[in-house]
């Protein structure tokens, strides 16, 4: 499961979904994750100017903040961001990776030196790119 930006937020939610409880699917339906430059704790969104059009309730914020549900995470996760991204995307990615590690779950934090928010996901298309190489290794299809 992979996602970038808002897609990384959604990927994070998918990664902490209890597949057996929600859909009667095997718990290992998802095998691994890549979350690139996403939002994993939605409280800052509610505190920002976006709150004028993003109307979250406390319950929605709690439910959709994947960083708060890491007890349900059961797959390895790659978290990535670029050094030319906004400070909030960088912070959210670092904090998410740290929280996953603290929860005792397998995580790899990748920092794309010189990549902005729109360039870093392009490295997924290249098997030798930062994200492409990491995902192939996570899948057991290439060495690091």
Task: Map each language-model feature to its residues.
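Alpha/beta-hydrolase superfamily serine-hydrolase fold, recognizing
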Residues: 1-144
